[in-house]
Amino acid sequence: MSTGGDRLPEAFLRPGSSSFVEFLREVAPQSHPEHARPAGAGDVVHATTIVALSFAGGIVMAGDRRATMGSFIAHREIEKVFPGDEYSAIGIAGTAGIGVELVRLFQLELEHFEKIEGAMLSLEGKANRLTTLLRGNLGLALQGLAAVPLFGGYDLDRAAGRIFSYDVTGGRYEERNHHSIGSGGMFARGSLKKLWRPGLGDRDAIAVALAALVDAADDDSATGGPDALRGIFPVVATVTAEGYRRIAEGELAGLVAEIDAARAQAREGDTR
């Protein structure tokens, strides 16, 4: 209800929670993802593979660009890795529409908290807020419309990168060193286990993330590898003490070329 004239509704003026999600439920409940109308599971677009790994200065997160609808390639250039805020990144796998809305709501949640409280949430606090958002989507997840995030960032208190995985119920699990999710996650995880090592520099860590996505694309039809012909490369970002940085496609193209050349040379040297 308006307080008169051109003033904002009363809900916008009185003191309230630092949670944007709670505010949204009160002011515009129909806009909350938990009230979205379910569609048939076969009619929706699915995002696929996300990888994340730690390195000496923080974390790297990368996602392929393919989205599928059943057995069809629905999109070749979808983006699945986003900044949570200045010191965090979030990637999504599963129902793409639900996942993108989850990311937008999460970004608003962090921004709203900072404006109301005058301070930034700790990385642990951000991970907990994401748990709450996932539990709000549980009804749709049980109908087959699930989106699962991979979250990571730079912990200013610990001066180190940290990675968190989730299940559809909102269960949160901190991962050591690296993790992957999505349809190609198991293949990417095998690659990460072989290539990750302590003390990686940022460039080497980015190369490991790209190699893991290339391996996933080799075995999973729903994961798209780098496509130099079309100029389509994974979305790759680092989060360090300097903040979130998306890696330029020119830099990615050079690293992909190095990976391809090294693998071609290895094949030529294989005499089996």
Curated annotation (Swiss-Prot):
Active site annotation, chain numbering: 48 (nucleophile)
Disulfide pairings: none
Principal location listed in the UniProt entry: cytoplasm
One annotated Gene Ontology cellular component of this protein: cytoplasm
Chain residues in the propeptide: 1-47
Localization in the cell: Cytoplasm
UniProt keyword Hydrolase present: yes
Function text: Component of the proteasome core, a large protease complex with broad specificity involved in protein degradation.
NCBIfam families registered for this protein in UniProt: 20S_bact_beta
Protein name as catalogued: Proteasome subunit beta
Organism of origin: Beutenbergia cavernae (strain ATCC BAA-8 / DSM 12333 / CCUG 43141 / JCM 11478 / NBRC 16432 / NCIMB 13614 / HKI 0122)
Record lineage: Bacteria, Bacillati, Actinomycetota, Actinomycetes, Micrococcales
